[in-house]
Amino acid sequence: MESLKEMRKAQMSEGPAAILAIGTANPDNVYMQADYPDYYFKMTKSEHMTELKDKFRTLCEKSMIRKRHMCFSEEFLKANPEVCKHMGKSLNARQDIAVVETPRLGNEAAVKAIKEWGQPKSSITHLIFCSSAGVDMPGADYQLTRILGLNPSVKRMMIYQQGCYAGGTVLRLAKDLAENNKGSRVLVVCSELTAPTFRGPSPDAVDSLVGQALFADGAAALVVGADPDSSIERALYYLVSASQMLLPDSDGAIEGHIREEGLTVHLKKDVPALFSGNIDTPLVEAFKPLGISDWNSIFWIAHPGGPAILDQIEEKLGLKEDKLRASKHVMSEYGNMSSSCVLFVLDEMRSRSLQDGKSTTGEGLDWGVLFGFGPGLTVETIVLRSVPIEA
């Protein structure tokens, strides 16, 4: 029995998991938000719906978004008119592009992350791939392993259909893997596309317009490992704790269903209020062990689900205006990229901290929180420890 305990101890890391590198990628097609209402109603042959177009334009104007990236080209939409209908039978066309573009975009982000990490890709021991697009067998994890040329013995985990909160989920899982498999290095990839969800407008589904105004395509990749070798690796953030919570009275607030018409997304109006009204519970539980209760004393990596969510969180917690700056910047430049979005915010935080001459990767602060919000309603809470920025 003693030898079993010794074996178990030998498998565990000495310290917490750390994020060692970050890479991001977006499709080449760029859509300016100011022009998008005209483009969207033209491509979906819905210009006669003038009242609905006015509502959509208002949504776009209030979205905080300046531009978005999407894999769909004008040529693809013209060649696949069923995709442009509100409920056209278009799953095959959507799948044809998603099963190719999901791993391709993920690979682009992964190459950047591995390059920053600076170690051979043969040292990657585990792969976590997350997406709500292109469900297939074998999955995008298999495709990425082949495209990237990872070791065929890499231990893979494919996560489909979790939605926007999964940027926190993958970090929670990567933390567990890294800390319970000594010497492991986990490649985490989130690659999200609007291919399943793009559809034309309908007067009977105004909530669908919200997603059309916010969602975008993007991929983010991280390398996660515990006990980094300081001679060849450098931690960016330490993953101190991770938890998940279902919010009360939130059944059906955000739902997605795969149909012949693609992935239909349904949003209730009270989603921002449900998130902001319950956010203090996971926050208090996560930071109580550290004796932290001043939410302006930590740095914030919040999934920018939409402008109302960010605004109501600020108001609920009394956050200073600049606390959600990184989230708002990513929302402005990229839109809501589902699970990959919060990892873009993480990258923005470390880049901005360096550019502004801050003392740590957390805007000069030591402790921070990463929040993922999504269907359930589900909240993922990750406590982060920043690292000093070398002069």
Curated annotation (Swiss-Prot):
GO terms for biological process: flavonoid biosynthetic process; polyketide biosynthetic process. It holds the Pfam family Chal_sti_synt_N. One of its GO terms (molecular function) is acridone synthase activity. Its EC number is 2.3.1.159. Keywords: Acyltransferase, Flavonoid biosynthesis, Transferase. The keyword Transferase applies. It is an enzyme of class 2 (transferase). The keyword Amino-acid biosynthesis does not apply. It catalyses: N-methylanthraniloyl-CoA + 3 malonyl-CoA + 3 H(+) = 1,3-dihydroxy-N-methylacridone + 3 CO2 + 4 CoA + H2O. InterPro entries: Chalcone/stilbene_synt_C, Chalcone/stilbene_synt_N, Chalcone/stilbene_synthase_AS, Polyketide_synthase_type-III, Thiolase-like. The active site is at C164. SUPFAM superfamilies: Thiolase-like. Belongs to the thiolase-like superfamily. Chalcone/stilbene synthases family. PANTHER family: CHALCONE SYNTHASE (PTHR11877:SF14), HYDROXYMETHYLGLUTARYL-COA SYNTHASE (PTHR11877). This is Probable acridone synthase 3. It comes from Ruta graveolens.
